[in-house]
Amino acid sequence: MDSVIQEAKRVIIKVGSSLVTNDGKGLDANAIQKWAAQIAQLRALGKEVVLVSSGAIVEGMQRLGFDKRPVGIHELQACAAVGQMGLAQIYETSFRQHDVRTAQILLTHADLADRERYLNARSTLFTLLRLGVVPIINENDTVVTDEIKFGDNDTLGALVANLIEADALIILTDQRGLFSADPRKDPNAVFIHEAKAGDLKLEAMAGGAGSSLGRGGMLTKILAAKRAAFSGAHTVIAWGREDNVLTRLAGGEAIGTQLTAQTAQLTARKQWMADHLQTAGAVVLDNGAVQKLTAEGKSLLPIGVTDVSGSFGRGDVITCIDQGGRAVARGISNYASSDARRIMRKPSADIAAILGFVEEPELIHRDNLVLL
């Protein structure tokens, strides 16, 4: 098995907190200098690199004198604000030794959910890469309330991969990769060298009840690989303390677990819809509508909707849910939630009589719908 990183031209590298900090006591300058040296070598090979790095909160705790991770959200946000200064400084210093310029970009999921801000972020990143800069991205923990949690930057890395249509996502962690079970508890645990991104068996393995892999954050990494595959990006999950792991991957060596993207690449517009972590509302579909969407590639008609939840407007992205509660698609609604409730279960020919107007015969047109 050859590494998919060797042929990749544009790579997202996600480095977790445990790899850039001294056991939770501030940033590890030596480790960060090693990352910078390896990334500089990747750039010398002609690769464009974007780095997604955690570590701001831990650095802020050190600077503000916290012995333990604060419980209060505002204390965490204060740590993130203070620590982000140190994170940016040490990366800039480390990359400068290799004559590489860096840029700091702080994002929230809301930035990528808004179409205009999404396109602006995309254009800025493309410009930075064209200018030879290594963008260093982190979640803007200072202003968010529900994204300060373990593993969230795995998702952010996948979103950035989709945003700029990267060829590969490297998730560096404190574990060797994926196992079929917890190797510390199960002597029969098998290391997974390669699998398909989006394989439901992997999700079940990592997220089952009592799964140590799930508690260790492996489920977020598996889901991140699935998300990155929307844009055709392959994912490698590897132990970050492996000597020269990045340069060896770039040289073709197979390290860690490789999750290959085997789904058709989405258009930029459909990538944006798929990357909505939170949607304005949802519609529940009957079995016939699910079949039409998933197997036949049809539009969603009002007659196939059995329930509407949330408050959304025309043009908002909503989730389509099957009778079992599973999200099967996302799409742009042609009708506000109040109107959708009135026309659900009704044939499209009745829309004008019910509402007094017709926007479209479909609730969601197939061109504005993406399967999950």
From Swiss-Prot:
It catalyses: L-glutamate + ATP = L-glutamyl 5-phosphate + ADP. GO terms for cellular component: cytosol. GO terms for biological process: L-proline biosynthetic process. GO terms for molecular function: ATP binding; glutamate 5-kinase activity; RNA binding. SUPFAM superfamilies: Carbamate kinase-like (SSF53633), PUA domain-like (SSF88697). Substrate binds at residues 54, 141, 153. It comes from the Bacteria. Residues 280-358 form the PUA domain. It is an enzyme of class 2 (transferase). ATP binds at residues 14, 173-174. Its EC number is 2.7.2.11. Pathway: Amino-acid biosynthesis; L-proline biosynthesis; L-glutamate 5-semialdehyde from L-glutamate: step 1/2. Keywords: Amino-acid biosynthesis, ATP-binding, Cytoplasm, Kinase, Nucleotide-binding, Proline biosynthesis, Transferase. It is found in: Cytoplasm. Belongs to the glutamate 5-kinase family. Catalyzes the transfer of a phosphate group to glutamate to form L-glutamate 5-phosphate. This is Glutamate 5-kinase. It comes from Janthinobacterium sp. (strain Marseille) (Minibacterium massiliensis). The lineage of its organism: Bacteria, Pseudomonadati, Pseudomonadota, Betaproteobacteria, Burkholderiales.
